[in-house]
């Protein structure tokens, strides 16, 4: 077999794609992998992909609703004195319950309704921790199910059903512990929303457009937070807020899901070649393109070895990833980076949220401020690659967190710490979102969502720990965040670059391609 250098004149931007097309002369059939068919016949990002991408990514806004609603529902409202024994400046824990009252009434938040203050204040943090614990479990479960029998679309449908049911049910919680259970169950389904929607939205997109498209998915999450702040401003009762923020999941099921297609890659690895080809023809037709007769799809390892058409499903699991030295190292590093990045991202977000400002305006501004990070990262992603950008954004955040840790005292130094926090989260927001693209490209289709699920679980563990880092004070958390950024950036050195590489379908196909690429370039990578 000819090497890519012989055929392409040393074009290192496409080291694997040109060797994939194989014509079976006896049958007059040309068998291509999905990336090659998108590039040659269907279009990498046309009208079909744009519509599918936008509809699928609406799910990210739903995830923002179910996750960030706790900021408003669990807030501690303002209170006022109503008796002569109440003194301005006192803590309400020190006062007789009859001498003060909640300004907005007892039903404005869970804190005011169930008295989650003083000795019971820890219960607010407990709800948050258990929600993210549910996310961690759900990410693993739905990551596996979306790679296996349910598929990407099936998993997205299931998690939206669960979100709608338990999200609305939460509004009718009769007591605190029922509320805790329902938030945990909502977290379980929410953990599967983002990773399933991300893979479903990006898998039908060609390799040269996939990076920018992948980064663009996170605009929907930030937009969801911004919209939620407006909804919370209008609906001040926590029960009303849960109903209004959960109804969009029901509308998504009824209006949007029917117009979303399953991933052609999932069809292919499950042995459903006819369904995959039908979808590819639909993509080509909508994009104003045409797939010639005699052209069909094949898995990358079938194409590589010129095998016949496969009609059986190709299975993959985390066990296969762990047993493979190549995949195992990638998974361990991906999990570690996701954990450290999440601590910094959520930790800095909570630090900014602790500012004594208008809560609704503050949440809105924080959501909007992340968008420039997404835009800049998207522009640089295909110019400099995933690996350098992952290292650079984490170390950018590390530098400003180190500045925040180094300056002590009040006065102007508080402003320096605030600016350091904003710039720190600016860098880490780019990393946090870049990781979805990077990790998705590091693993083949048969285990892609399972690997993303593991990384998401690690990120949720970081989210659980972040509040405990924040309570260390004003300066010490910056030191922890700086160390996390430094370590995460260092670990990224051990990952391979995936820019302009195809998305592989099977473990065998990825192993063969990576081994040949290493031999040709004389490199050893994870």
From Swiss-Prot:
Cytoplasmic side: 1-52, 145-153, 201-214, 262-331, 382-390, 440-451, 497-526
Gene Ontology CC: chloroplast thylakoid membrane; plant-type vacuole membrane
Gene Ontology BP, a term: cellular response to water deprivation
Keywords, sorted A to Z: ATP-binding, Ion transport, Membrane, Nucleotide-binding, Transmembrane, Transmembrane helix, Transport, Vacuole
Pfam families: Sugar_tr
Principal subcellular localization: membrane
Tissue specificity statement from the Swiss-Prot or TrEMBL entry: Mostly expressed in siliques, and, to a lower extent, in stems, leaves, flowers and siliques. Present in pollen. In the stems of secondary inflorescences present in the phloem cells and xylem parenchyma cells.
Residues engaged in binding ATP: 201-208
Subcellular location: Vacuole membrane
Induction and repression of expression: During drought stress treatment.
Domain of life of the organism encoding this protein: Eukaryota
GO molecular function: ATP binding; transmembrane transporter activity
Topological type in the membrane: Multi-pass membrane protein
InterPro entries: MFS_dom, MFS_sugar_transport-like, MFS_trans_sf, Sugar_transporter_CS
Transmembrane parts of this sequence: 53-73, 124-144, 154-174, 180-200, 215-235, 241-261, 332-352, 361-381, 391-411, 419-439, 452-472, 476-496
PROSITE patterns given in the database record: MFS, SUGAR_TRANSPORT_1, SUGAR_TRANSPORT_2
Family membership noted in the UniProt record: Belongs to the major facilitator (TC 2.A.1) superfamily. Organic cation transporter (TC 2.A.1.19) family.
Function: High affinity carnitine transporter involved in the active cellular uptake of carnitine. Also transports organic cations.
UniProt name for this protein: Organic cation/carnitine transporter 4
């Amino acid at each position: 077999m000819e090497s890519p250098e012989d055929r392409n004149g040393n074009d290192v931007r496409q080291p694997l794609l040109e060797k994939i097309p194989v014509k079976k002369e006896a049958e007059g059939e040309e068998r291509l992998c999905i990336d090659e068919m998108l590039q040659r016949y269907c279009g990498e990002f046309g009208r079909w992909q744009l519509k599918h991408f936008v509809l699928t990514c609406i799910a990210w806004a739903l995830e923002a609703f179910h996750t960030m609603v706790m900021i408003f529902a669990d807030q501690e409202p303002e209170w006022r004195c109503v008796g002569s024994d109440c003194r301005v400046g006192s803590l309400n824990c020190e006062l007789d319950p009859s001498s003060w009252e909640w300004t907005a009434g007892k039903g404005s938040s869970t804190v005011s309704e169930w008295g989650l203050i003083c000795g019971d204040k820890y219960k607010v943090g407990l709800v948050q921790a258990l929600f993210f614990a549910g996310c961690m479990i759900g990410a693993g479960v739905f990551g596996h199910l979306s790679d296996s029998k349910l598929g990407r679309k099936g998993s997205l449908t299931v998690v939206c059903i669960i979100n709608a049911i338990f999200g609305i049910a939460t509004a009718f919680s009769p007591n605190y512990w029922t509320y805790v259970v329902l938030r945990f169950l909502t977290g379980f389904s929410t953990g599967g929303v983002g990773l399933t929607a991300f893979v479903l939205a990006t898998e039908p997109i060609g390799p040269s457009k996939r990076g920018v498209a992948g980064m663009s998915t996170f605009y929907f999450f930030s937009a969801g937070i911004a919209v939620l702040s407006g909804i919370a401003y209008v609906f001040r009762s926590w029960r009303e807020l849960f109903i209004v923020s959960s109804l969009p999941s029901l509308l998504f099921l009824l209006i949007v899901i029917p117009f979303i297609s399953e991933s052609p890659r999932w069809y292919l690895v499950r042995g459903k070649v006819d369904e995959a080809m039908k979808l590819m023809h639909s993509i080509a037709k909508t994009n104003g393109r045409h797939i010639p007769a005699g052209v069909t799809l094949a898995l990358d390892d079938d194409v590589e070895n010129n095998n016949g058409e496969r009609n059986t499903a190709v299975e993959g699991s985390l066990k296969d990833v762990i047993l493979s030295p190549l995949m195992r190292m990638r998974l361990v590093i991906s999990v570690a980076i996701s954990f450290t990045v999440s601590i910094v991202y959520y930790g800095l977000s909570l630090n900014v949220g602790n500012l004594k400002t208008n809560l609704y305006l503050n949440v809105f501004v924080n959501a909007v401020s992340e968008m420039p990070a997404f835009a800049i990262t998207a522009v640089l992603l295909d110019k400099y690659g995933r690996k350098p950008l992952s290292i650079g954004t984490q170390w950018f955040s590390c530098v400003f967190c180190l500045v925040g840790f180094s300056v002590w005292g009040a006065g102007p130094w508080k402003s320096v710490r605030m600016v350091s926090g904003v710039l720190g989260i600016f860098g880490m927001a780019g990393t946090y979102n870049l990781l979805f693209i990077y990790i998705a490209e590091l693993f083949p289709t048969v285990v892609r969502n399972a690997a993303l699920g593991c990384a998401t679980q690690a990120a949720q563990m970081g989210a659980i720990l972040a509040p405990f880092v924040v309570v260390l004070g004003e300066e010490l958390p910056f030191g922890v965040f700086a160390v996390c950024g430094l370590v995460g950036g260092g670990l990224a050195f051990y990952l391979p670059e995936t820019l302009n590489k195809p998305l592989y379908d099977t473990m065998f196909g990825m192993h063969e391609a990576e081994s040949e690429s290493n031999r040709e370039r004389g490199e050893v990578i994870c």
